[in-house]
Amino acid sequence: MEIRGLITRLLGPCHLRHLILCSLGLYSILVQSVHCRHHDIGSSVAHQLGSKYSQSSSLSSSSQSSSSLAEEATLNKDSDAFFTPYIGHGDSVRIVDAELGTLEREHIHSTTTRRRGLTRRESSSDATDSDPLVITTDKGKIRGTTLEAPSGKKVDAWMGIPYAQPPLGPLRFRHPRPAERWTGVLNATKPPNSCVQIVDTVFGDFPGATMWNPNTPLSEDCLYINVVVPRPRPKNAAVMLWIFGGGFYSGTATLDVYDHRTLASEENVIVVSLQYRVASLGFLFLGTPEAPGNAGLFDQNLALRWVRDNIHRFGGDPSRVTLFGESAGAVSVSLHLLSALSRDLFQRAILQSGSPTAPWALVSREEATLRALRLAEAVNCPHDATKLSDAVECLRTKDPNELVDNEWGTLGICEFPFVPVVDGAFLDETPQRSLASGRFKKTDILTGSNTEEGYYFIIYYLTELLRKEEGVTVTREEFLQAVRELNPYVNGAARQAIVFEYTDWIEPDNPNSNRDALDKMVGDYHFTCNVNEFAQRYAEEGNNVFMYLYTHRSKGNPWPRWTGVMHGDEINYVFGEPLNSALGYQDDEKDFSRKIMRYWSNFAKTGNPNPSTPSVDLPEWPKHTAHGRHYLELGLNTTFVGRGPRLRQCAFWKKYLPQLVAATSNLQVTPAPSVPCESSSTSYRSTLLLIVTLLLVTRFKI
């Protein structure tokens, strides 16, 4: 079902602008039982939330705001694209999970749906071990292909290597099972399917949005891994394993913007990526063996085990594996740092715009169960909380597209519907508790965020206010209204404190400042402050931490100029896209991309982004310590080193505001006026006095 149709059916125009900032509502800060959860947030799918679901959300205090990431993008049919589609696999599966000690046998019948024209990927068995493109993995032989990077350099690529059995039929919603052995030589020359998900159609064929849509066929048969190796074949090369983002409801490893060829060939590293289940198919939780939750994270974990056991066959060093990901991908990386099941499967981590403490990263078990039952009800399945097996049995029979089309009605407002949960298996406790107790992998991390993290999502939610065009501004009245819509669960004192913190008091009526304040409000709450928190905790434990603030806006960026440097804008440069001369990047942007790739690959090789000897081309990147808190600004022609970033605003969200809410929970505070009086600054004097007084009460216990 198209998102446009859902918007028309579910939403009246007056509801569209209520969808954004509710996820910014402080509800998840104030009520710790739920942690909301990419290019990981704000996506078209948030528009599917109708007023009837908003009303139903009041039935449960655990139902919270739904902020959806638009991390889905373009269907690129270009024959030169790095990834092109294929499908394959047999019909019966033998479940033998040596890692978990599980033995059983089930069968997927031949009626399993396949896409027309795509066949099983087996080649003739005439390949010999002398063929450098034929690799013998622990499950069987695979044949790769040689590709040319845009720079003209060659790489060898193996795409669509099965690391798990297809999660079809009775395996839907379950943890993955290792792939079975095969005979002959398996063709690994075409990229894998993308896992079933909704597709962003909100802005039509606008490239700034469609670049995140899956570009290979959608299928439940999607658990495959890709390996790209520089030529000549290295020995014991560092491995960089990419985990894509998309709010846990979308995304695919095959996007053009993730093209592995340039990074691998320019930096002499092996680049690996994996597909994992998203949306309800990957994260539905009912607390039963049939629907244990976190299936998508277990997919990732199984892929990490495959890399550990096989990457040496491709010239990689299994003792130098670095995970890197963005948005929900960065959250995934961070959860592997926390999980006892994953900690020993890799060495280092790069987290781009994501942290496990983000309000959208996890939900409680109770909320996850409620959402699963709402989905069951939406697709006419049994939804009795005392008969969960009946719900799962029915949900397994439904078309996967029907599930993902209906899951956005399974929650109140402004949350990604199916995200990780503390399941007692992959995660034993909340990320906050793990960080506080020091129960996480002690290692080197590189992390950071972008200057305008919030705009991408606001454009999808406040569609009437922030239109996708130049010259958009926000009046003071519109700003105050947006803050109210953004924070529906907090009292008047807290809401006025937010207004005060994000007002430009030099020019409080400046329409550009008011617009930009909304971006900072969203970006600080959902991204920057959580990234800061994670980096700080790692630094306090004595780990090597390197932090960045990404500030470069591509000259060819299709979004309006006022959107600045948005969520995900660094990805092109990490993978070396500017080096593709056909895409029109300027020479200084090509050099900048080379610098970013070198920083990232240096870190993967040594745990330090700096070169072994000082270089004028690579400014020194200082460590982010618990006291210094330094970060490097990543932009054209800049070597600026700052502290933070945004320490004051993050102290506001993480320290001051929770205390203010606690101190004023029983007070009635007059809300700020919709239209400021003669002077915007004078209208808040009484409120400011109250806030300061309450802070003193909280701080000094007077």
Curated annotation (Swiss-Prot):
Keyword presence, Secreted: yes
Single biological process term from Gene Ontology: acetylcholine catabolic process
Keyword tags: Cell membrane, Disulfide bond, Glycoprotein, Hydrolase, Membrane, Neurotransmitter degradation, Secreted, Serine esterase, Signal, Synapse
Keyword Zinc: no
Region of interest (Disordered), ranges: 107-134
Name of a matching Pfam family: COesterase
Reactions accelerated catalytically: acetylcholine + H2O = choline + acetate + H(+)
UniProt-annotated glycosylation sites, renumbered to this chain: 187, 637
Family label: Belongs to the type-B carboxylesterase/lipase family.
Function summary: Rapidly hydrolyzes choline released into the synapse.
Protein name, entry field: Acetylcholinesterase
Gene: ACHE1
